[in-house]
Amino acid sequence: TETMEKEFFRDFEKLYSRVFVVYDRPKDQEHPERNMTSRIMRRYYKNDMDLEERKLQLTLYPEGGNLVAGVENCVAFEAVWNDGEWLEGYLHFGGDSVPAVHRGRGVFTVTPEKGMEREVLFRTRDGQDISASLPKAEEGVALQVRRTEDAWRIRIQTSGPLSPDSLLLTVMREGVLKEYKRIDSTYQEFTLAEDTLEAGVHQATVFDTQGRVYADRLFFVRKKEVETASLQVEGVREEYAPYERMELSVSGQKSSTPISVSIRDGYMHETLYDNASIMAEMLLSSEIHGFVPDPGWYFEEDDENRRQGLDLLMMTQGWRRFKWRDMAVKGEWELTETAEKAQV
């Protein structure tokens, strides 16, 4: 509901669990306050000390991580209140207007000159303005990832004295290498057939032989066979009398497998923003930074709006699991704890 949207919105500065949400950061890490709420019983409100004047925030996210001089860059943006509620409106830059298409997010293109410093303006539907400065454009590597009809196109452009033949591109999923390409020109495109990739978050990274990362981008691959429910239940009515016998028809795959069944009163069901299915939780929510509100929305349909919203989510909340230099260069890291010899 709209009321819950304002009271229980995600905040990147808070801590989250898959089981329940921790709304206020504990003061003491060793003995955290038990300042939690059973949401069925009552609402939760922030501590008075956390209340502050609402302010508009505009954040810019250059695709790949950096704004690169002399080449075309895509920049995602997110316009929200400081408590996380998103805004509707348009971003204005260089005479162009770009709408916020999903949860205050959108994307625009720019070809900056080296050292260029400019501001962009976001105007809300009710006429409020908020501005933000573009990062200073430097020489480096611009990375763009786009989905075509049945493949993913990765475009790499270098700017400045970088030697292209020292750069490499990897595509990984859950830490497993899926593609490995050597970059041998200042402008290069690679096409990855979608049927060679698995469902879930993939990480495209451009780095050199020393392990220095120049660009990094997350993108999400959808698979209909994964998203389609393997079981269908028929025969559920809107209402039942107390202790009334129920007969349901379950159909699905022919393979024999154990199935768990859970029955609850739909009247007591509370609509939450954390409405992810097991698939959405494993493939999406657990793979990116921060709480993802209403993750089930991205998988309700396979249309352009949801694909665009999913890609904007990757460009704004996407993050790297580890530092590539630490993992790639010998001597950059050492074990601080011995390996466990049994289950924890």
Language-model region placement:
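Short, small/polar-rich motifs associated with maturation and membrane association
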Residues: 196, 201-203, 208, 213, ...
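Beta-strand-rich binding/interaction modules
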Residues: 1, 72-96, 117-124, 151-181, ...
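Low-complexity, Pro/Ser/Thr- and charge-rich linker/hinge segments at domain boundaries
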Residues: 11-12, 19-53, 58-60, 68, ...
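Edge strands and adjacent loops of beta-rich recognition modules
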Residues: 45-70, 132-147, 162-164, 315-341
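Exposed aromatic-hydrophobic patches
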Residues: 105-113, 153-155, 188-195, 216, ...
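Acidic glycine/proline-rich low-complexity segments
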Residues: 2-50, 133, 218, 254-335
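Short beta-strand segments within Ig-like beta-sandwich modules, predominantly Fibronectin type-III
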Residues: 97-104, 180-186
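Short acidic/polar inter-strand loop motif in beta-rich domains
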Residues: 2-11, 124-131, 176, 206-216, ...
